[in-house]
Amino acid sequence: LIWDVNREIFSIGGFALRWYSLLFALGIFLGYTIMYRIFQKEDKPIELMDSLLFHIVIGTVVGARLGHCLFYEPMDYLTNPIRILKVWEGGLASHGGFTGVIIALILYCRRYPQISFFWLADRMTFPAMLAAGCIRIGNLFNSEIYGHKTDVAWAFIFKKIDDIPRHPTQIYESIGYLSISAILYIIYRLKDRKPTEGSLFGLVMIMAYSFRTYIETFKENQVAFEDNLTLNMGQLLSIPFVLFGFFILFGGHRKLKIFHPGLTEFKKVPAKVEEKATKNSGKSGKRKKTNPKT
């Protein structure tokens, strides 16, 4: 299959809407819609959704951008730091994006301690994988993150790159992430919307990054220094996430206070207890007057 699709849907003046941007936005929109329904179904404050969206978008973009700059082209960006801000030039790393989302969720739950980190993280797994599947199709339209040359019947010739038939690894990844999203959602429903704390969060890291480690074997390296590595950068970055996923799945997170910000907040005292305490305080304040000794 010859793949020579225009990266831009349309352009007006100096503005151009790309397929990648549209699919990125579609992933965010679908994720937001799913989380909105979950908040409704599980009686969480809907008014907190806008803040959640803000945290997620900022965490994703900032994390993905910094991840690319630090892991794939560190010297280029350290010598010219202003380029880090030029997101429109391309260069986003999913490992950095995932890390950025985790940090964003921690900050969000510190701001709104009525929302548990793992309650939120577990339920965001399948929307996140759905969004990741959309983004990989965006990579396909950009003719980037493509695979090694191959003679399989479904090989793609990316005309913007060369005339060599290659593995369409963007499609492989998209199908994989969408499948993981479906599996996690099925588990969520089988558990009657009450999965064990941290179980889906741990599973998504194990499944997604184990799959990513495997798919990387079909991909071309993204930067030259990877040619001298036994494992490429995508695999090296995936392994810690898989290990952390097992750590979470087997309950190691219960000892990490950073994931339980609500525990450090003062709980609201029930009205009756507070009233009783006030009365007792008033009684203790009424002391019997005595004549001073002379």
Model-found features: residue ranges?
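A feature for loop-to-transmembrane-helix boundaries and adjacent hydrophobic helices
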Residues: L1-T294
